[in-house]
């Protein structure tokens, strides 16, 4: 079903994605890379909390302005018929919007009439990402009426990628939570001991495992100055 070039694209994409350990980089990168395999006009990568609410600051949207992002996250997410699937699936699953509801039913929903149709994104597909029996995210691609619906080959590609994406997202989210905890500890340490902004910056880089030379290159100061800051810390 796939050409050799398409298989190579998938392999190279996964190899690159597995090296990413920052959540915002991961979500933006995958949304951009997937276009090489599945053309789309707009899309989003939604991150969900334990209550299936959108973690707005950590979610990534492409092709939408801020007003539309806010309308979806604040109003239309609760009306999105994708939630019909939430209670019926137990593992990471690929879906196509036109397969969730019959067209005559779908086109009468508020979500279709007030959001999808005005934004000209009437065709959609994606992945509901589940790890340890919990929905952790939702990956959605959209097309306008002119571009047409997503086909079986494109859904096949998503099925090939789905478990990789779920595993990568789970790992990156775990690292993100750990990073937030560490940053809070570093900030508290800096406040307690009255570190300067430069000393705080160097402390953060040390925590990331950078050598004195790497810190010197990054903040554009000499290695000897780096050592002086470390001594003060």
Predicted feature descriptions by range:
Residues 1-19:
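Signal-transmission linkers at sensory-effector interfaces
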Residues 210-233:
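Recognition helix of helix-turn-helix DNA-binding domains
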Residues 176-201:
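Regulatory hinge/linker segments at domain boundaries
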């Amino acid at each position: 079903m796939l050409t050799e070039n398409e298989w190579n694209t998938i392999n190279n994409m996964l190899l690159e994605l597995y090296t990413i350990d920052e959540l915002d980089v991961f979500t933006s990168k995958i949304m951009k890379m997937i276009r090489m395999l599945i053309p789309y006009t707009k899309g989003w990568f939604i991150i969900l909390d334990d209550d299936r609410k959108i973690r707005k600051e950590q979610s990534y949207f492409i092709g939408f302005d801020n007003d539309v992002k806010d309308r979806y996250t604040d109003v239309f997410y609760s009306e999105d018929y994708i939630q019909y699937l939430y209670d019926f699936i137990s593992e990471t699953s690929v879906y196509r919007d036109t397969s969730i509801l019959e067209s005559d039913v779908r086109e009468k929903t508020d979500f279709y009439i007030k959001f999808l149709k005005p934004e000209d994104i009437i065709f959609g597909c994606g992945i509901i990402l589940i790890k340890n029996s919990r929905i952790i995210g939702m990956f959605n691609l959209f097309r306008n009426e002119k571009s047409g619906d997503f086909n079986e080959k494109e859904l096949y590609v998503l099925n090939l990628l789905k478990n990789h994406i779920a595993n990568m997202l789970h790992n990156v989210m775990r690292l993100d939570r750990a990073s937030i905890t560490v940053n809070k500890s570093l900030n508290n340490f800096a406040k307690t001991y009255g570190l300067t902004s430069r000393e705080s910056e160097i402390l953060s880089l040390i925590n990331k495992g950078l050598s004195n030379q790497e810190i010197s290159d990054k903040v554009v100061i000499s290695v000897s100055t780096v050592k002086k800051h470390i001594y003060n810390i």
